[in-house]
Curated annotation (Swiss-Prot):
Signal peptide: none annotated. This is Protein NDRG1. Disulfide bonds: none annotated. Sequence repeats lie at residues 339-348, 349-358, 359-368. Interacts with RAB4A (membrane-bound form); the interaction involves NDRG1 in vesicular recycling ofCDH1. Interacts with APOA1, APOA2, PRA1 and RTN1. It is found in: Cytoplasm, Cytosol; Cytoplasm, Cytoskeleton, Microtubule organizing center, Centrosome; Nucleus; Cell membrane. The lineage of its organism: Eukaryota, Metazoa, Chordata, Craniata, Vertebrata. It comes from Macaca fascicularis. Residues 345-371 have a biased composition (Basic and acidic residues). Under stress conditions, phosphorylated in the C-terminal on many serine and threonine residues. Phosphorylated in vitro by PKA. Phosphorylation enhanced by increased intracellular cAMP levels. Homocysteine induces dephosphorylation. Phosphorylation by SGK1 is cell cycle dependent. The gene is Ndrg1. Stress-responsive protein involved in hormone responses, cell growth, and differentiation. Acts as a tumor suppressor in many cell types. Necessary but not sufficient for p53/TP53-mediated caspase activation and apoptosis. Has a role in cell trafficking notably of the Schwann cell and is necessary for the maintenance and development of the peripheral nerve myelin sheath. Required for vesicular recycling of CDH1 and TF. May also function in lipid trafficking. Protects cells from spindle disruption damage. Functions in p53/TP53-dependent mitotic spindle checkpoint.
Amino acid sequence: MSREMQDVDLAEVKPLVEKGETITSLLQEFDVQEQDIETLHGSVHVTLCGTPKGNRPVILTYHDIGMNHKTCYNPLFNYEDMQEITQHFAVCHVDAPGQQDGAASFPAGYMYPSMDQLAEMLPGVLQQFGLKSIIGMGTGAGAYILTRFALNNPEMVEGLVLINVNPCAEGWMDWAASKISGWTQALPDMVVSHLFGKEEMHSNVEVVHTYRQHIVNDMNPGNLHLFINAYNSRRDLEIERPMPGTHTVTLQCPALLVVGDSSPAVDAVVECNSKLDPTKTTLLKMADCGGLPQISQPAKLAEAFKYFVQGMGYMPSASMTRLMRSRTASGSSVTSLDGTRSRSHTSEGTRSRSHTSEGTRSRSHTSEGAHLDITPNSGAAGNNAGPKSMEVSC
């Protein structure tokens, strides 16, 4: 059966970090609740933006190592398209213990929670605010934590956006290399090499320098080292792609996997995608993008997140972009996840796609002509009767 390929123009945006800017200048203050919540495995700093709306889930974020919720997510959540989404949802930002701004050093002998224990702290956070369910957004270590939380508590997670997720335990060779690097390499360099690819370190010098300065000047080095050790000691998530007639451990909720094409996490994200239910999973690869797509490509990620949420049935069609409405009206279709059906681009069941910029919005553009290529993740159509994950490149 033939499949239609659709090219969609995408407008790029200027980097959010310009020369001379600092992380502080990028972060806008919110009128929010901030609390240190006691859980089974210690205290965790939580920031709740907005008021939870009835039975609707909240968007819960978890950051990567070397970051906190502000440096990891504020540039994305301050972007205008994302603010359109957050009008419909409260947002709960979780900072890993000791990673928030101004965090005090842990006492000598403090046992930092394991990655599994960090995930086990989240039910207490939801209980504190009276929250029943979440749409999770995690990056790196945070993506691992939210995935573990969803595996343990599937009834609490309605969807996951996982940026740079690595489902595997660190191999013993990687572990040894990280230990040796710890003896010879400064902590900021270790974190920067985790966050950014080699190409990006040369092409986006100012961005890398900005985050390096944040790590040096704003992060508590002892606390950060404990968080890094916890991440490097993570267990394999032991997830498997479900097969008919077998019982496997995998995510039960829809998942959007996101990675930049020059990110150091590309291979890990592709590996994770191969272990998830292809009928519920979309892999979004961002072209000309490094390790932090939420920083360098907020427009694309916000649009993908909008369609992801609409596919879960939450945002009304009035919130769809002009392009999305026109495609819905015309009944244009895209190859479905099982490779055998076509599906209209409605707000129900829509997978992540990016769009041309609307003339009514004010944005800064640096280049034009990018396109969206929608293809099945593995194998050609007709060669495999089984379902295929959808891979979206933009």
